Amino acid sequence: MTNKLIIQGGKKLAGTLQVDGAKNSAVALIPAAILAESEVVLEGLPDISDVYTLYDILEELGGSVRYDNKTAVIDPADMISMPLPTGNVKKLRASYYLMGAMLGRFKKAVIGLPGGCYLGPRPIDQHIKGFEALGAKVTNEQGAIYLRADELKGARIYLDVVSVGATINIMLAAVRAKGKTIIENAAKEPEIIDVATLLSNMGAIIKGAGTDTIRITGVEHLHGCHHTIIPDRIEAGTFMVLAAASGKGVRIENVIPTHLEGIIAKMTEMGIPMDIEEDAIFVGEVEKIKKVDIKTYAYPGFPTDLQQPLTALLTRAEGSSVVTDTIYPSRFKHIAEIERMGGKFKLEGRSAVVSGPVKLQGSKVTATDLRAGAALVIAGLLAEGTTEIHGVEHIERGYSKIIEKLSAIGADITRSTAAETKL
């Protein structure tokens, strides 16, 4: 890609940042609309490439999608179970939600194995285990997953690994199955509650979303509805870290503070002043940051998606901080890039030791995945001089209007249009 972000670092940021709808909800809510038989209206969707890719896929299936600003009106009435072995499905990891939704509605689907961020092995074996338990035959042929069922019947499904994707996918497939489904060792993320709320508004019978046991009683038909997406807790957390790194008073609006308890606790431990309101968080200016140890866990633990952005902030902390990722042990690709800027790190197994404080210097760096990109933006804002970040497409997959938002609070950040490439 010839696209790059250019950041002139060292500026103090002040003002208000608005958080958009949750990316990890949006990519499941849009496929979930396939299960309805009339119009579904989704409000508050983020303006990111994954969302537009999903609109294109729904239109390929024969659905109609009208969208304006952050609202989409999806009419799934004329959809057919068209095979999707290649094409748009390969562009995003979350295209696997089409498996559960199409299986639930049509009893069959062909979905090319998805792309998105590369974070080491991310098998979908738990998804497949769930589909098979519901009565589907699943085969992998030439890089595409083929699913077919004469009928779907409720089942008791125990997830061997707590997986957000598998929990949601099994919910999508089970809401129109015959009888009762119980998902045990289910993931508890807020995005799962969001998807369950949409499905319930469509007429599904779901109990226990947000706990480790979800009970679903299948229904024959689901109807359209109105649904407003929850705010993106990872975008909110990223903005909190960014405000602590380079801010002199930044207010972050459209947040649900209970979704952010992990990052709030750690930033408090680091000595960062915060004012927590009902739907906003104010992050004050901080001179000295205390070192802190972090371990990522499934929700409600500290989120793996905020591990990388926080690593950039820890270059400012006094002493050695240890960051351990128990979810994705190989999620440290950003470290080599921040080292180019003068960061001091030591990798030990699934942990990174961050030594500080160091003054980062602008450099040419590359984002290898979405949250690594966020970490490099924070590092670039902290650094003296000019930072060029390549791999912009990764950042734009998950952060909508990032340049406009950061420019509005005083960041000097531009997108190079060297050879404009359509993303």
UniProtKB/Swiss-Prot annotation:
Sorted UniProt keywords: Cell cycle, Cell division, Cell shape, Cell wall biogenesis/degradation, Cytoplasm, Peptidoglycan synthesis, Pyruvate, Transferase
Extent of the signal sequence: none
Binding, phosphoenolpyruvate: 23-24
EC number: 2.5.1.7
Lineage top rank: taxon: Bacteria
The reaction(s) this protein catalyses: phosphoenolpyruvate + UDP-N-acetyl-alpha-D-glucosamine = UDP-N-acetyl-3-O-(1-carboxyvinyl)-alpha-D-glucosamine + phosphate
Compartments (UniProt record): Cytoplasm
GO biological process: cell division; cell wall organization; peptidoglycan biosynthetic process; regulation of cell shape; UDP-N-acetylgalactosamine biosynthetic process
Broad class of the protein's primary localization: cytoplasm
Pathway: Cell wall biogenesis; peptidoglycan biosynthesis
GO cellular component, one term: cytoplasm
Active site: 117
Residues bearing the modification 2-(S-cysteinyl)pyruvic acid O-phosphothioketal: 117
Gene Ontology MF: a single term: UDP-N-acetylglucosamine 1-carboxyvinyltransferase activity
Residue positions binding UDP-N-acetyl-alpha-D-glucosamine: 93, 122-126, 305, 327
Family: Belongs to the EPSP synthase family. MurA subfamily.
Protein's job: Cell wall formation. Adds enolpyruvyl to UDP-N-acetylglucosamine.
Name of the protein described by the UniProt record: UDP-N-acetylglucosamine 1-carboxyvinyltransferase 2
Originating organism: Listeria innocua serovar 6a (strain ATCC BAA-680 / CLIP 11262)
